[in-house]
Amino acid sequence: MADLNVGVVVFPGSNCDHDTEYAVASFSGVKPVMLWHNEHDLKGCDAIILPGGFSYGDYLRCGSIARFSPIMREVIDFAGQGRPVLGICNGFQVLVESGLLEGALIRNAGRKFICRQSTISVVNNSTIFTDRYEKGEVLRVPVAHGEGNYYASVETIDSLESNGQVVFRYTDAEGNATAEANFNGSLNNIAGITNKQGNVLGLMPHPERASEELLGSGDGRRVFESLFAHLAGTKRSSRGCCSTSPTRRSAS
């Protein structure tokens, strides 16, 4: 994995950048490249992660200012090439504001900031971010957000569901998508989605905060393991007869 480069974008107000750096480095031995918001160069990174936090103080709306930062122009181009982009919490909000993912993230149904352990189920394990999981597997991953309520038009929700773009869903410990498990009010209990191509994932729960048992759960670690397995496979292919890029695969 030594020849893999992963970039972690740092906005003013990011506060999970070093958590993400640690989660990646702890199992891969790869120290991520920290990319400041005003940079114009992704420095040869193979994947980009937008971490959690409160970019630009969450002024106007979460992620609405970060979308205009110079680095995001590069990230948008990078994603357009089919390259992997992962947005966690505020990173998910930035991806939505940037148009890389559909829908919106609005105030939690109870109008309060929520910081707690959540249980989510793997809806689609046929993505480059989730293929180390079993379909239907229930994970314990913490959340910390005030605007994590996923909202979209009926047509968009139907499209996300039918295309296998819903990747994680808030559920109870048995995997049931109940109203009680849906603490922020997200439509269809949606906790994470991809774009149609499957190379961009946004989720509100924090996998980097569930990357080892010492933290209370190691269930989030396989998001990063799945991504690195994909990157390593792509590197091997590019050295062989041809290169590959992430494509949308249907849920198994």
Curated annotation (Swiss-Prot):
It comes from Chlorobaculum parvum (strain DSM 263 / NCIMB 8327). SUPFAM superfamilies: Class I glutamine amidotransferase-like. This is Phosphoribosylformylglycinamidine synthase subunit PurQ. The active site is at residues 89, 206, 208. Part of the phosphoribosylformylglycinamidine synthase complex involved in the purines biosynthetic pathway. Catalyzes the ATP-dependent conversion of formylglycinamide ribonucleotide (FGAR) and glutamine to yield formylglycinamidine ribonucleotide (FGAM) and glutamate. The FGAM synthase complex is composed of three subunits. PurQ produces an ammonia molecule by converting glutamine to glutamate. PurL transfers the ammonia molecule to FGAR to form FGAM in an ATP-dependent manner. Residues 6-237 form the Glutamine amidotransferase type-1 domain. Part of the FGAM synthase complex composed of 1 PurL, 1 PurQ and 2 PurS subunits. One of its GO terms (cellular component) is cytoplasm. It holds the Pfam family GATase_5. It comes from the Bacteria.
